[in-house]
Amino acid sequence: MIRNGWRVLSHFFLAGIFLVLVQSSGFCAALSFQNDTFAFQNATVLKYKNGLPTLQRKLASDPANQYTRRCFVMSRSVVQFHKFARFDSRGPALDDKQLARRIRAVARHRPWASALPEDQRVVFPGYANLREMSKARREVFQKNLGSGFATYFRPSNARMFFQRGREYQDKTHANLDAALARGDLFVAYLSTYPRLSINHAVLIYARHPGHSESGTEHYLVYDPNHVEAPRELTWSPGERTFTYQKDIDFVGGPVRIYQAYGKWLQ
């Protein structure tokens, strides 16, 4: 009886130590697509059908046309909220001005930095998670996450012109696996230059366990253009090539990947 009592006490003691470490360290739980991504989408400037742009003109009244060119901004922001924010559904929700200040406070953190301890994160009361809050307060988020226009002038975008070989994709694949293995996230710039079938940023957040018979590796992707479900990226070791799934705004097929926000000037 005494032995069992000591065993129970030891379990409580270890659980307490774990909670203290989580509160005081940069522990970061795995990203949940349904909880930790935005409820609103980044809209394409053009209208698409079967992955190809059409000549059909978008109307000013089209609600999907109001928030565009933010794929980099939204992918980066999901990383920042995952690392530097926490939610408290028990407290009263902030007014628009207070919420805007806290969103900008999160956006000022370097996305490549280590996750903050829970007690040092920016707190967002009134909501359980990012998905819930961004659905209820969409306009405040869209006004304060940052400019999409500025992402066109990121210095590392130039890699698509001169880093186009398979050796570079091998290195990127290794960096991707290393990032996911240590519990980090990986913002990916997708390009098919000199073809222009895709010029886009997404967030790779998990790898499917195991391999297919061909050795193909599968990854789960948050795509800011598609908020309803994760997308899939694959890596073929034989061809040393990434492939992104077909969608309404992409024909599907091989893409080159360049990591973004993994370090300064990237």
Annotate each predicted stretch with a short phrase.
Residues 2-14:
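Bacterial N-terminal signal peptides that target proteins for export
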Residues 12-23:
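Bacterial N-terminal signal peptides
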Residues 158-174, 261-266:
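Exposed acidic/polar residues on beta-strands and adjacent loops within beta-sheet cores, strongest
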Residues 164-210:
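Active-site-adjacent substructure of cysteine-protease-like catalytic cores
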